[in-house]
């Protein structure tokens, strides 16, 4: 950029600005401005032609007046004339005026475009940069239509100077963000990728920003950028390389470019090329290693640059979710930041660890920092950091630490900021339900929630506790006793009155034998709260009173007196008046038998999915973690509620006040299958079917009933749509895509992630399995801005799979808006052992063109594993029983991934097997046991994995009671190491 000479200074402009600043009042300023406008207008209209300097000076004055907030309605043509000047300073002022004052509807736009085209066509790099800056600053659609085709040509031209290339890249980025349809994809796309190798810092930085934006909507067109980005990143972070060493910022080479390259790589899955992937892993390890080195400078700029690269590296590791070693190292590095003196670092560490907690590989590592996170929740001064600590506790919670985390969050709730109390309440309610084994603890937790933060307990929370208490006989008496005691508090929240009124109305008879909670005492306690409550709560209490008349006839006269009172029969609220009149008449004219029939105890609610999680997601907003982020398999527990909370049903829970009046009774849910324990192992290592006794649910099986298979004559209770979609036959769909097997293998040891992604569609999966039942959620995301038409995903059973696996689907909307996501629920039942997965066919129309693809659904036989613990003696006894040649499958293979004991352990647990300690004489070996649960039979499975670190080899041996199962499990598991 040429320097401005001393003669280019505009004294008249400086004097005018000084006069404006010296004005003592608004009126004086306006007077001075009007005087100057009159002078400028006379100069422009005068007979004497103005030279370039004068035009520039007067245009600058007009621009200054406009920036002061005054309208300018003349001088535009003079500014346009400056664009034709060959002097840089005059052309610069002309472009500045145009960028600020001229809108796209101006009559001068054609003249402006011609001037810009002339400058772009010139070979003067300074003029070209001014024109490109103007296009980017205006950024209108009209500008895009005029120049979108020219700018890519300038960008990739071999004779363009570096400054022009940089400006062209940023200008094209601005136009693409404003009007993506105007930027044509063509031959230049392949050439722009090679700008990543440019030696000019400005060019490569601008190119990375442009490519990152372009590849989000056209990933296939820019796929070659992966290897180039990895190569450039490797050269920057490697101490042996001299690439961009001149651009070192406080001892950190090219930090902004490094961050942008890492962000670009997050637009794609892990590299398929082994060499590229290895080089990238080496880069990531180098960044993590440098984070452990002592700082080279004490200045904050050094640590900021270093940490910016580190956090972006961790984001890339989390995005890939395929390198267990890196995930654990990232978690350990973030753990060091949890106690850093810098608040921002603590915040970022907590935020990143929330995402790490959802990975099966790093969840256990995150849990080791629970004490530090709890301390942050108690002691942090910044509310946003405390909120992130609460988020992390929620994310790291599983069966092993649920009571501790819920207790700490309840304690924090007493002093929590009002802005986040509702969110904390929802999280506590979800965790209490999700990990409840002892339901008395669940009841205590919810009542504590109401006591501590009653104003923030939404209807979804207390509706849910009523539903669970109604459905479980073993907790009804305890719930009645607990709410009775809670209602005795002098200050009792209205939500507590609602819960107490409902539960005592239904189950008050269970505690009526105690003189301290006799029927008159119960009624007196409830009625003492009546006049302090809202209309809705009083309506519920009136329903409780009529229930009392049925449960406790001795209270009839007292309650009728309350109903007969003028304050009820002539109540200004129609709802209360009607209830009082109808209940009084019902209790007076109906016989005891009729009254008992009308007011009988509520039947169990049909099993439905909790709506509390949906409330939390709405509270967090669309920018919260993706539906896939929370899903993980809880390897510390053998219960399905260790997984993700299901997405709520569209059918809402009935109002408790309506329930007291008696809704249509729904049949109680079928009893779940009997639990499988270690003592059943002796019976399952045979080919014969095993009967499952029909027992009532135990607390440990609380959530298994949600996955109970339907009765033969009825659809699955969990599905809102009772009519499953008709699946096309295998002959109606195309073959699976070439990478279907590779995508399937990613899910053998995990239950959540992205199943498929291209430039149009993303398909995510999260699933949970228990015994022979499973539920899978498929998320279809439209990545384009155009609506998908005739969207039809179907599940197909090839061959004999129909008799081996039952999959029932819920229909999805036929239209998927641009940028939207739809969910499909699949309920799965394993009937017999199977070897091939079902197929997922997705068909839709995009822009008038039919699209279709076929994938393999990630449902493999190991998903129905039940981990089984046993002693060494029992293991070897079973091992010998399964000694027939057809019962054993063995494979010796070379390691495809780094041999790490912790990673191997995590994969075996993710596979579904229990790991047995002190069984194999060689402590380096892994021994596991489990039972494959099917409806027809159970197949016992024993495995032994022998790693040889020196030879980088494994030997895997599996023994089951069925030869095909042994071979299939061996093949599935061997591909994971």
Swiss-Prot record:
Keyword Transport on entry: yes
Major subcellular location class: membrane
Domain of life: Eukaryota
Gene Ontology annotations for the cellular component aspect, listed alphabetically: AP-2 adaptor complex; apical plasma membrane; basolateral plasma membrane; cytoplasmic side of plasma membrane; filopodium tip; glutamatergic synapse; membrane coat; postsynaptic endocytic zone
Chain positions found as Phosphothreonine: 653
UniProt biased composition (Pro residues): 666-675
A Pfam family that the UniProt record links to this protein: Alpha_adaptin_C
Tissues and organs where the protein is expressed, per its UniProt entry: Expressed in the brain (at protein level). Isoform A: Expressed only in neuronal tissue and skeletal muscle. Isoform B: Widely expressed.
Phosphoserine modified-residue sites: 626, 652, 655
Record flagged with keyword GTP-binding: no
Record keywords, A-Z: Cell membrane, Coated pit, Endocytosis, Membrane, Phosphoprotein, Protein transport, Transport
Residue ranges of the region described as Disordered: 614-702
Listed Low complexity bias regions: 646-657
Molecular functions (GO terms): clathrin adaptor activity; low-density lipoprotein particle receptor binding; protein kinase binding; protein-containing complex binding
Membrane topology type: Peripheral membrane protein
InterPro entries per the UniProt record, alphabetical: Adaptor_Complx_Large_Subunit (IPR050840), AP2_complex_asu (IPR017104), ARM-like (IPR011989), ARM-type_fold (IPR016024), Clathrin/coatomer_adapt-like_N (IPR002553), Clathrin_a-adaptin_app_sub_C (IPR003164), Clathrin_a/b/g-adaptin_app_Ig (IPR008152), Clathrin_app_Ig-like_sf (IPR013041)
Subcellular location per the Swiss-Prot or TrEMBL entry: Cell membrane; Membrane, Coated pit
GO biological process: clathrin-dependent endocytosis; intracellular protein transport; negative regulation of hyaluronan biosynthetic process; positive regulation of neuron projection development; positive regulation of receptor-mediated endocytosis; postsynaptic neurotransmitter receptor internalization; synaptic vesicle endocytosis; vesicle-mediated transport
Family: Belongs to the adaptor complexes large subunit family.
UniProt-listed PANTHER family: ADAPTIN, ALPHA/GAMMA/EPSILON (PTHR22780)
Subunit structure: Adaptor protein complex 2 (AP-2) is a heterotetramer composed of two large adaptins (alpha-type subunit AP2A1 or AP2A2 and beta-type subunit AP2B1), a medium adaptin (mu-type subunit AP2M1) and a small adaptin (sigma-type subunit AP2S1). Interacts with HIP1 and RAB11FIP2. Interacts with SLC12A5. Interacts with clathrin. Interacts with SGIP1. Interacts with RFTN1. Interacts with KIAA1107. Interacts with PICALM. Together with AP2B1 and AP2M1, it interacts with ADAM10; this interaction facilitates ADAM10 endocytosis from the plasma membrane during long-term potentiation in hippocampal neurons.
Known function: Component of the adaptor protein complex 2 (AP-2). Adaptor protein complexes function in protein transport via transport vesicles in different membrane traffic pathways. Adaptor protein complexes are vesicle coat components and appear to be involved in cargo selection and vesicle formation. AP-2 is involved in clathrin-dependent endocytosis in which cargo proteins are incorporated into vesicles surrounded by clathrin (clathrin-coated vesicles, CCVs) which are destined for fusion with the early endosome.
Name of the protein in its database record: AP-2 complex subunit alpha-1
Annotated source species: Mus musculus (Mouse)
Annotated gene: Ap2a1
């Amino acid at each position: 950029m040429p320097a401005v000479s001393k003669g280019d200074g505009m004294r008249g402009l400086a004097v005018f600005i000084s006069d404006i600043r010296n004005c003592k009042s608004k009126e004086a300023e306006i007077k001075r401005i009007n005087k100057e406008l009159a002078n400028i207008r006379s100069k422009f209209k005068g007979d004497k032609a103005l030279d370039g300097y004068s035009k520039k000076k007067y245009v600058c004055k007009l621009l200054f007046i406009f920036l002061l907030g005054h309208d300018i309605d003349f001088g535009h043509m003079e500014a346009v004339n400056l664009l034709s000047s060959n002097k840089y300073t005059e052309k610069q002022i002309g472009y500045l005026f145009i960028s600020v004052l001229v809108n796209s509807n101006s009559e001068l736009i054609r003249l402006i475009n011609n001037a810009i085209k002339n400058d772009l066509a010139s070979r003067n790099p300074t003029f070209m940069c001014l024109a490109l800056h103007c296009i980017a600053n205006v950024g209108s659609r009209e500008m895009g239509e005029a120049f979108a085709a020219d700018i890519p040509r300038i960008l990739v031209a071999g004779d363009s100077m570096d400054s022009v290339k940089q400006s062209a890249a940023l200008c094209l980025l601005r136009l693409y963000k404003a009007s993506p349809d105007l930027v044509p994809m063509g031959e230049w796309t392949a050439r722009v990728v090679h700008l990543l190798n440019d030696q000019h810092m400005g060019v490569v930085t601008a190119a990375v920003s442009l490519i990152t934006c372009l590849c989000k909507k056209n990933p296939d067109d820019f796929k070659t950028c992966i290897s180039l980005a990895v190569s450039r990143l490797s050269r920057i972070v490697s101490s042996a390389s001299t690439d961009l060493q001149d651009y070192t910022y406080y001892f950190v080479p090219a930090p902004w470019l490094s961050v942008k390259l890492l962000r670009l790589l997050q637009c794609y899955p892990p590299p398929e090329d082994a060499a590229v992937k290895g080089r990238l892993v080496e880069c990531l390890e180098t960044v993590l290693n440098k984070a452990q080195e002592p700082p080279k400078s004490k200045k904050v700029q050094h640590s900021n640059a270093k940490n910016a690269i580190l956090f972006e590296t961790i984001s890339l590791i989390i995005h890939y979710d395929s390198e267990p070693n890196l995930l654990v190292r990232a978690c350990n590095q973030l753990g060091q930041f949890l106690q850093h003196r810098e608040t921002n670092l603590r915040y970022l560490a907590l935020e990143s660890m929330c995402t790490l907690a959802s990975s099966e590989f790093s969840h256990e590592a995150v849990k080791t920092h629970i004490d530090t996170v709890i301390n942050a929740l108690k002691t942090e001064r910044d509310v946003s950091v405390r909120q992130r600590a609460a988020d992390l506790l929620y994310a790291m919670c599983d069966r092993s630490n649920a009571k501790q985390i819920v207790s700490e969050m309840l304690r924090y709730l007493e002093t929590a900021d009002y802005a986040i109390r509702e969110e904390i309440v929802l999280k506590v309610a979800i965790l209490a339900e999700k990990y409840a084994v002892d339901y008395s603890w669940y009841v205590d937790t919810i009542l504590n929630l109401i006591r501590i933060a009653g104003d923030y307990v939404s209807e979804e929370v207390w509706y849910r506790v009523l539903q669970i208490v109604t459905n479980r006989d073993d907790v009804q008496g305890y719930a009645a006793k607990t709410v009775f005691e809670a209602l005795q508090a002098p200050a009792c929240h209205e939500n507590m009155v609602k819960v107490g009124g409902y539960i005592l109305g239904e189950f008050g008879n269970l505690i009526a034998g105690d003189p301290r909670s006799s029927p008159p005492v119960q009624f007196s306690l409830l009625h003492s709260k009546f006049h302090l409550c809202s209309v809705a709560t009083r309506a519920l209490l009136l329903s409780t009173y009529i229930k009392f008349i049925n449960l406790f006839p001795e209270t009839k006269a007292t309650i009728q007196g309350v109903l007969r009172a003028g304050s009820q029969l002539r109540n200004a609220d129609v709802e209360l008046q009607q209830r009082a009149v109808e209940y009084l008449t019902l209790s007076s004219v109906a016989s005891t038998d009729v009254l008992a029939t009308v007011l009988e105890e509520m039947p169990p609610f049909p099993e439905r999915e909790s709506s509390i999680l949906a409330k939390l997601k709405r509270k967090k907003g669309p920018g919260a973690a993706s539906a896939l982020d929370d899903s993980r398999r809880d390897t510390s527990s053998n219960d399905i509620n260790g997984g993700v909370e299901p997405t709520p049903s569209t059918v809402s829970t009935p109002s408790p006040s309506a329930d007291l009046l008696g809704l249509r009774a729904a049949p109680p849910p079928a009893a779940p299958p009997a639990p499988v324990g270690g003592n059943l192992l002796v019976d399952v290592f045979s080919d014969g079917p095993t009967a499952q006794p029909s027992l009532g649910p135990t607390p440990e099986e609380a959530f298994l009933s949600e996955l109970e298979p339907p009765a033969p004559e009825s659809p699955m209770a969990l599905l809102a749509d009772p009519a499953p979609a008709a699946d096309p036959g295998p002959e109606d769909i195309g073959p699976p895509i070439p990478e279907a097997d590779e995508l399937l293998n990613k899910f053998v040891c995990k239950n959540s992630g992205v199943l498929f992604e291209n430039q149009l569609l993303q398909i995510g999966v999260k699933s949970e399995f228990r015994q022979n039942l499973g539920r899978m959620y498929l998320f279809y995301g439209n990545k384009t801005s155009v609506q998908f038409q005739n969207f039809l995903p179907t599940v197909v059973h090839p061959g004999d799979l129909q008799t081996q696996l039952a999959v029932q689907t819920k229909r999805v909307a036929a239209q998927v808006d641009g940028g939207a996501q739809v969910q499909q629920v699949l309920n799965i039942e394993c009937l017999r052992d199977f070897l091939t997965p079902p197929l997922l066919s997705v068909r839709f129309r995009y822009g008038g063109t039919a699209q279709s693809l076929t994938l393999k659904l990630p449902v493999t036989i190991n998903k129905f594993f039940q981990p089984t613990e046993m002693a060494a003696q029992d293991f070897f006894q079973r091992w010998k029983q399964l000694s027939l040649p057809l019962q054993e499958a063995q494979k010796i293979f070379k390691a495809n991934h780094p041999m790490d004991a912790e990673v191997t352990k995590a994969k075996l647990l993710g596979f579904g097997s229990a790991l047995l300690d002190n069984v194999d004489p060689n402590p380096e070996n892994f021994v596991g046991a489990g039972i494959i649960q099917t409806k027809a039979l159970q197949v016992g499975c024993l495995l032994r994995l022998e790693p040889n670190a020196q030879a980088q080899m494994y030997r895997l041996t599996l023994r089951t009671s069925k030869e095909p199962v042994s071979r299939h499990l061996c093949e599935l598991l061997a591909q994971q190491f």
